[in-house]
């Protein structure tokens, strides 16, 4: 049982951006019915399977029921309309205009069920030069500024996250939006059409600090100079670790743990603002000091000083081993 018990969701989405959002609703107790083509959704066929199911498909669709329909056939259409009669949520992520051409647009579904929450996920929204373009995660990473945020600090070369991130951020946004729409229907008696783009979701996700440099018009700064403070991977004698200090007390604790109390009074690092603006210098100094210690010992010293810290799963020496490929 979960907070969405009794909520029925029709999930016509595919790939990752929609299915993960619907899966979150299922995790919270909703009855989610995944509507797939007769051949099965594409992700089913994109990796090796175990007992007939591949891990990516499973991890995007757990907790759902599934039905295969030929939505071009009259029978398939009638079944979908029947399912929509008592559904609470209808989710789709076809390219703009496609769902209307298929005959299942928001206006059509609302004629069947006036109280339904209708969610449309797209890459770029319904208007603009990219509106009808095909979209996958790397495209959104590039256009949203993610590749700039991830750029190599030395060369400036844009870099991507090594995971699908835009699809999953959109899914989280979609699940939250649907939950809010269900609450609004309960409290205000309104049923909404939620139009959500992957690009909007990503920009909103990155905005608080990733795009802080452009918040104030005519007072922009290059936020990339500040983001280096997040690259807190250090190499101890035997493995990689992460550790950091944000507050004054944490910085003082780090200096003591490293036996570098002289840095406490260093004007460059004496304030939070100073530690951010001089992040690269600070990282180089702390990195050089951490490299003198065995990881277990320095992590224990950091922990005793109440710093946030953790070992990295990958062994430092293992990571330098040549690839056998």
Model-derived features with residue positions:
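N-terminal helix-loop segment corresponding to the beta1-alpha1 unit
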Residues: 1-187, 213, 217, 324
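Structural signal for conserved beta-strand scaffold positions within catalytic alpha/beta enzyme cores
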Residues: 11, 34, 68, 120, ...
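Glycine-rich beta-alpha junction loops
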Residues: 39, 124-125, 198-203, 238, ...
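Residue-level detector of beta-strand structural context in well-folded domains
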Residues: 56-58, 194, 232
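Active-site-adjacent beta-strand anchor residues
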Residues: 92, 196, 243-245
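Substrate-binding/catalytic subdomain of NAD(P)-dependent oxidoreductase enzymes
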Residues: 182-221
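Aromatic-enriched alpha-helical interface/lid elements that frame and gate functional surfaces
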Residues: 225, 229-306, 310
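Single conserved hydrophobic/aromatic residue that forms the stacking wall/gate
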Residues: 308-325
């Amino acid at each position: 049982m979960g907070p969405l018990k009794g909520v029925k969701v029709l999930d016509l989405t595919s790939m990752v951006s929609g299915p993960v959002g619907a899966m979150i609703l299922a995790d919270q107790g909703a009855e989610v019915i995944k509507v797939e083509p007769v051949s099965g959704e594409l992700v089913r066929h994109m990796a090796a399977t175990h007992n007939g199911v591949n891990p990516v498909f499973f991890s995007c669709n757990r907790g759902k029921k599934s039905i295969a329909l030929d939505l071009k056939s009259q029978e398939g259409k009638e079944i979908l309309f029947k399912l929509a009669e008592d559904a609470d949520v209808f989710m789709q992520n076809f390219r703009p205009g496609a769902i209307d051409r298929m005959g299942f647009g928001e206006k059509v579904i609302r004629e069947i069920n006036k109280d339904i929450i209708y969610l449309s996920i797209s890459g770029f929204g319904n208007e603009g030069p990219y509106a009808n373009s095909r979209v996958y995660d790397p495209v959104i990473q590039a256009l949203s500024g993610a590749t700039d945020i991830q750029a190599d600090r030395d060369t400036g070369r844009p870099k991507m996250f090594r995971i699908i991130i835009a699809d999953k951020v959109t899914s989280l946004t979609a699940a939250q939006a649907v939950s809010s729409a269900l609450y609004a229907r309960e409290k205000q008696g309104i049923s909404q059409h939620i139009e959500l783009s992957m690009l909007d979701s990503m920009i909103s996700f990155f905005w608080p600090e990733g795009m802080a440099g452009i918040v104030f018009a005519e007072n922009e700064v290059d936020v990339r100079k500040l983001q280096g403070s997040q690259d807190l991977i250090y190499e101890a004698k035997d493995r990689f670790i992460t550790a950091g200090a944000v507050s004054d007390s944490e910085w003082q604790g780090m200096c003591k743990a490293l036996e570098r109390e002289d840095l406490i009074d260093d004007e460059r690092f004496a304030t939070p603002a100073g530690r951010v603006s001089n992040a690269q210098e600070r990282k180089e100094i702390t990195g050089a000091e951490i490299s003198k210690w065995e990881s277990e010992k320095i992590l224990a010293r950091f922990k005793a000083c109440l710093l946030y810290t953790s070992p990295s799963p990958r062994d430092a020496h293992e990571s330098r081993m040549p690839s056998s490929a």
